[in-house]
């Protein structure tokens, strides 16, 4: 299963990538890293990820807009929101739009692994 990581923080992109690659999540491979929604849509069209981790607060195209664009492109993409957003209304909006799960920053490696496996239907 291919994973696209979308977050404007290089530190978070690297951490999620490390958790996936070194954390024993078998069957998930990295499809790409994007620092904003526009990059995410471009990379998704080229790599066709099955799973996406999505920050909600990003420049240029935020996570809500990106979720809508990705699901228009491929309604089967499984999205896990990973955000420090304190406004729960936006997180609920993301879930209503089709995101399958939410992990609040800061997160533990184990919390992220379990959420990814759940969203990817691999648990």
What are these regions (language model features)?
Residues 8, 105:
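A Lys-centered signature of the CheY-like receiver
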Residues 107-116:
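C-terminal output helix
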Residues 47-53:
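Active-site beta3 strand of CheY-like receiver
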